């Protein structure tokens, strides 16, 4: 087996006996793949189809069934003197087992980070994430009440269909 180095990693099924691991490594996203149920892995490579931004952020991957894989994380942007650059929560979709990201959709345009996803029993996609009411999270140590909350989005099962709202 080969070793995958990085932090804040997520793993998802991406087809029969195939797995992908998505890794935050500094400001960038890296991916590695296994074709034998996780016994061996490809060398991790930078995933240019996913956002890179200063400071980076944890993101989530989730199997959508078959070869479909979803990625959810902030797109990011410019920091300000009072706010970080973690905002614009995006959902990316890969019908090719995370080998390329063919569609993306803005889910939440304000402060967002640290999402996690799961498929519900009825096929809907659930996403829980940290959210805030401004463009980026407040960076000062004294923060007002409500500066951050947990939010949940439930997307319909049709989100995995090729043409659904990603066009």
Predicted regions located by residue number:
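Asp-box/BNR beta-propeller blade signature and adjacent active/binding-site loops
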Residues: 1-167
């Amino acid at each position: 087996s080969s070793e995958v180095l990085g932090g804040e990693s997520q793993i998802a099924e991406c087809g029969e006996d195939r797995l992908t691991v998505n890794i935050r490594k500094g400001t960038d996203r890296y991916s590695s793949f296994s074709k034998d149920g996780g016994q061996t892995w490809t060398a991790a490579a930078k995933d240019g189809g996913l956002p890179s931004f200063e400071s980076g952020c944890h993101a989530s991957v989730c199997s959508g069934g078959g070869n479909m894989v979803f990625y959810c994380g902030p797109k990011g942007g410019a920091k300000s003197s009072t706010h970080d650059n973690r905002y614009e929560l995006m959902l990316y979709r890969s019908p090719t087992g995370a080998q390329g990201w063919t569609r993306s959709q803005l889910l939440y345009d304000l402060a967002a980070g640290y999402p996690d996803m799961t498929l519900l029993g009825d096929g809907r996609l659930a996403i829980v994430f940290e959210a805030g009411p401004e463009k980026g999270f407040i960076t000062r140590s004294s923060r007002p009440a409500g500066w951050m909350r947990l939010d949940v989005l439930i997307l319909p099962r049709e989100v995995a269909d090729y043409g659904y709202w990603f066009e």
